Amino acid sequence: MKELFLSLFTVKDLRNKFLFTLFVLFLFRVGSYLPIPGIDSVALKSYFKSQSDFSIANYFDFFSGGAFSNFSIFMLSIGPYISASIIVQLLVYSFPSLKKMQEGDGGRQKTKKYTKYLTIVAAVVQGYATSLYAKGIPGAVTIPFYRYIFVAILTVTTGTFILLWFGEQINQRGVGNGTSLIIFSGIVVRLQAALFNLFQSMQDPSQNVNPVFVILIISIFILVVILIIYEYKAQMRIAIHYARANSNNTVSSYLPIKLNPSGVLPVIFASVLITLPLQILSGFAETSSIARQILSYLRPNGFYYTFLNVILIIGFTYFYSKIQLSPKDISNNIRKNGGTIPGIKSDEMEKYLDEIMNKTLFSGSIFLSIIAIIPFLVQNIFRFPHDVSRIMGGSSLLIMVGVALDTLIHIDAYLKTQGFSHGNKKNYAFLQKI
């Protein structure tokens, strides 16, 4: 780990990229405290302070890094964009004609354009829903409501696209994946508050928090982090033999299939897909008994919420991994390059790879699901503060560890392109292990 931090400060270009990334994330944090025009911050603070840990409002606030409770310009984060991306990818996967349209640079540009159009639609819908939610907060809206709706929708939609631009700037000039780091930073800022609440609960006799349980949970937290790292690196290697030109000899290689090829994306997608309808329903909770009933069933970290989250994680693990690693495309590429899999006929290669992928994806999705239910277990068994249970496991921990590992891989790739992987192999041994 020491070598990693040294590289961030001793390699000039990498240092500049790292500092630029921190600067962009700092701008995101500043924007999280800038409220939408027409909102009374004092009324908001009083309202959110009165909300229980189990409320939908606190759930939104947790994953937005505090932007939701401030009704800030970034209160939707990049959720609308992720929702739009899911819809577009589902359509492309379902319709072969759309899949053909995506081929080539021109096709990919069209897909990006349609995704941005859908992002606007999703942001407008969510912006309208949050406007209705603000109307239900006593004294929160200080201007005529019809005017506030227009201002709020325009502001949060613009805020979402500003964050997308931030993410693109990090991709081009910074370190790591920009959109993932924005989500990551929003969760990390809640870590300090969660730990503070934990130690505060230990000192409060009415909370009845056993210090032994605290040590146990922290130990479990460390163990889970280690398991996530190992799961992230785990892979099955399939031997491949390539025939040499003008020779009877073969060259042996292998095809690595990760336990979870899509990384942290299924968890992010599942979280966003749950949040979207919850945000819309919360806007109508004041006037609709049906919306209130659905929200009560989908209480964060409740049974139905956890069950739905697990189903979505499993579904997105299979869906997104099959998009990234198509058995048909892989088998075609192996055959084109004169490769064979020992013991497998050429025309059965696709079926074999599909079976192997299904087995690895099943194990990977079950692991992610087990991690996802940890907050539910911690909250209901040990009665820990709600934000503490979210940090100790589940989607938040998977996102934090997954994005951190992805960033390390980006750093490793950059160092290799700059010639550090050979000349300074000893100094970057930690990165090589990752």
Swiss-Prot record:
GO terms for cellular component: plasma membrane. Keywords: Cell inner membrane, Cell membrane, Membrane, Protein transport, Translocation, Transmembrane, Transmembrane helix, Transport. It is found in: Cell inner membrane. It comes from the Bacteria. Its main location: membrane. The keyword DNA damage does not apply. It is a multi-pass membrane protein. The keyword Mitochondrion does not apply. One of its GO terms (biological process) is protein transport by the Sec complex. Pfam families: SecY (PF00344). The chain crosses the membrane at residues 19-39, 73-93, 117-137, 148-168, 179-199, 209-229, 264-284, 300-320, 362-382, 391-411. Belongs to the SecY/SEC61-alpha family. The central subunit of the protein translocation channel SecYEG. Consists of two halves formed by TMs 1-5 and 6-10. These two domains form a lateral gate at the front which open onto the bilayer between TMs 2 and 7, and are clamped together by SecE at the back. The channel is closed by both a pore ring composed of hydrophobic SecY resides and a short helix (helix 2A) on the extracellular side of the membrane which forms a plug. The plug probably moves laterally to allow the channel to open. The ring and the pore may move independently. Component of the Sec protein translocase complex. Heterotrimer consisting of SecY, SecE and SecG subunits. The heterotrimers can form oligomers, although 1 heterotrimer is thought to be able to translocate proteins. Interacts with the ribosome. Interacts with SecDF, and other proteins may be involved. Interacts with SecA. This is Protein translocase subunit SecY. It comes from Borreliella burgdorferi (strain ATCC 35210 / DSM 4680 / CIP 102532 / B31). The lineage of its organism: Bacteria, Pseudomonadati, Spirochaetota, Spirochaetia, Spirochaetales.
